[in-house]
């Protein structure tokens, strides 16, 4: 698990992201990322299973969605052969699922990719009852 630190006064950029994503990040006002966000994205793109913990507003969700968008946009060959990029982002709050799906579509604008937001947060107690 990667724990997001509270020292977020420095920012950096990721130059190795697909060009379309970099343009869409700038258009969305997300060109300057925190060091922690860059580390989350780096680990995600390296293929590490990424579980992130941190305070509200730390940018965890944004970083993970950027990672998903980067992988999806870099998978052009897969898209051309009809294979969809794989990924699953589980949230505890329905609002986060909606925000993640909307941000993904904004960051992949022009690619034709779509996202669906799914949250299991409110269903967990019901699932435990069924067991």
Please tell me what each predicted stretch does.
Residues 34, 62, 97-98:
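Loop/helix-junction capping segments adjacent to catalytic residues or to phosphate/diphosphate-binding pockets
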Residues 41-47, 60-81:
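Walker A/P-loop NTP-binding motif
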Residues 19, 23, 38, 42, ...:
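Solvent-exposed alpha-helical segments within well-ordered globular domains of core cellular machineries
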Residues 28-31, 47, 71-75, 107-114:
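Conserved, well-folded catalytic cores of nucleic-acid-processing
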Residues 82-131:
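Conserved nucleic-acid-binding Ia/Ib motif block in the N-terminal RecA-like helicase ATPase lobe
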Residues 2, 6-53:
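Conserved pre-motif I regulatory segment
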Residues 52-68, 86-87:
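Glycine-rich P-loop/Walker A and Walker A-like loops and their local beta1-loop-alpha1 context
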Residues 34, 52-53, 76-81, 116-118:
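Active-site phosphate-binding and catalytic loops of NTP-dependent enzymes
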């Amino acid at each position: 698990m990667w724990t997001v630190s509270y020292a977020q006064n420095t920012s950096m950029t990721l130059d190795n992201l697909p060009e379309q994503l970099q343009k869409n990040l700038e258009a969305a006002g997300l060109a300057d990322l925190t060091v922690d966000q860059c580390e989350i994205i780096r680990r995600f793109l390296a293929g590490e299973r990424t579980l992130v913990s941190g305070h509200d507003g730390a940018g965890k969700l944004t970083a993970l969605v950027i990672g998903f968008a980067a992988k999806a946009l870099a998978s052009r060959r897969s898209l051309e052969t009809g294979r969809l990029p794989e990924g699953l982002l589980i949230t505890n709050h329905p609002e986060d699922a909606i925000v993640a799906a909307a941000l993904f579509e904004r960051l992949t604008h022009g690619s034709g990719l779509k996202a669906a937001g799914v949250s299991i947060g409110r269903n967990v107690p019901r699932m435990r009852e069924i067991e």
